[in-house]
């Protein structure tokens, strides 16, 4: 089922691979239309509009996976490495559940900031915006460069599901397994244990 969806709609999946003609046509069409890059002042309203569109379509998330709904966007921000971002967002009501949801997005941002303080580990830049009663966690994509560049990426979920002898919820354990198979050097395995 996932492969069928990726073949039809996988134009902006993680990494550099695009599967199938339909997804490639969708990606090429998007590039020909030159998706607008949101200015710093337009970003909050742009994110709010994207969240509302996703909510009105009843889409719970994206092909990027995870428990929070999300979308990808292009935004201009001084000092950013790339305009490409993944944006997770909360709902916009005042319930306790939505408040916890918003708090978790903020905690994820703080965790990314904490990881960035470890000299030997690189982590994506992130920031939190609050607008229209929603919290938005914006994370720079490390698999994109410039407006059109795509870098290779294989998620840990994909590797575990297809290549590792067993799965783990522990990154350090997964790193040790990949090191034992010769896929990661000792430094990379140690970095995963640190995280």
Predicted regions and their residues:
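Phosphate/dinucleotide-binding and metal-coordinating scaffold of catalytic cores
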Residues: 1-195
